[in-house]
Amino acid sequence: MKFNIAKKGGVVAQLVFEEKIEGGYLNHLKEKELFSGKAEDVYYTLDSNLKAQLFIGLGKEEKIDLEVLRKTFFKAASELLKNKVEEVELNIPKLNNLCNYKTAEAIAEGMLHATYKYDKFKSDRKEQTEITVNYNPEKGKEDRAEKGINEAVKLMEAVFLTRDLVNQPANVIYPETLAKIAKEKLEAKGVKVTVHGKKEIEALKMEAFLNVARASTKEPKLIVMEYYNNPGSNEKIALVGKGLTYDSGGYAIKPATSMVDMFTDMGGSGTVIGAMHALADLKAKVNVVAVVASCENMISGDGYRNGDIIGSMSGKTIEIINTDAEGRLTLADAVYYATNNLGATKLIDLATLTGACVSALGEQVSGAVTNNDEFFSELVKANERAGEIVWRMPTIEYYKKMNESKVADLKNSGGKLGGMMTAGLFVGSFLAKEDIPWIHIDIAGTAYITEKFGYLKENATGTLVKSLYYMLSKEA
């Protein structure tokens, strides 16, 4: 999809507010129940002269917001693609209280979402129509609109990178290839990427991470990404992503039906890599480090077992209650490394961690636990800008006690109750200093969805790449 600013040509889209359908052809369409003007209502047709017409409903004028624009223009672009339209003209007036910059960004984002396809393994895949969008904003606001569109294009490139990583199967994306792609994609944008193999991980004494990786023939990789673009600041924010490229459950083996999509268990690492891509590509004024401890959780004669007691980089010991509660073990060492060795002053970890989160919040809302109200409020503000939802869960002492072991410092499963909170608090207990502002985000339901929602097609979503960019770049 190509965007031009202040240019005419192509099918002229007619933008219609629901309350302004009065008489004439639009009223005829409404009576025939072909077009109502409601948000997300799009109608494409040919007139008697075979001239294409495109009607885009915006709903009630006072209710329009960025998410309405994303969903509506996703529908519009989908209709254009279906009808193989190559050029469209959008004449966008000032909308409600939205600035031209954010309006253009949301419209472009929605349209770009419609272009995403995951069909690389299909032998009969077809070429998609390349659409040219001639975008005409309010007069005098061309520069602001162009900035918004350029930001959307780069953000969506990062989101699509995340979606591609998460969608690909475990025989294609495993620790070595994940590290290779991260290095290729991010170094091209100015991010320093260091990949540590098994020997370096052993030297770091990352025992929790190594125990999870033991049974796999794929060598574990510790992927460290560094982006420094704010020399005047002492703040260094860490992003830590769960990097399980396949999770069989280990000896606490999953049922066959639950294993089918476990190549997506590296969703946290995909989000982190995508966020780093966006931050660097858009030259955000921020210092960010990112850490991914990537491995597979498999079964072999050398695999770790329920009942084992293992160490960790922090020195804390862990009783293994369940080998399928492995993600928090890899995160434990990664979080400690980020805060102790890299000196992160704040940290966000993201993981497809618990089924409990999916049961509680479904596929449209991510769950979170945090130790810092102010830090979390920054995320909420970014979520609002991005159209993404993260719901904060309680962190009362009761949940912390559930992680205590009688034979070790901690156990890796707090039991059946409060599973999302106990898992998150387990991860947080490996901060090098307990007062480091920290947010744990469980994206088990949102990283990979089973049903289409709004402008997100089923499968990988790229969730929270946008929110992390807005939050860390202070663009929210």
Swiss-Prot record:
EC number(s) per entry: 3.4.11.1, 3.4.11.10
Coiled coil: none
Family statement drawn from the similarity comment of this UniProt entry: Belongs to the peptidase M17 family.
Originating species: Treponema denticola (strain ATCC 35405 / DSM 14222 / CIP 103919 / JCM 8153 / KCTC 15104)
HAMAP family the record matches: Cytosol_peptidase_M17
Keyword terms, alphabetized: Aminopeptidase, Cytoplasm, Hydrolase, Manganese, Metal-binding, Protease
Protein name: Probable cytosol aminopeptidase
One of the GO biological process terms: proteolysis
Name of the gene encoding the protein in the UniProt record: pepA
Keyword Iron annotated: no
Xref: NCBIfam families: PRK00913.1-2, PRK00913.3-5
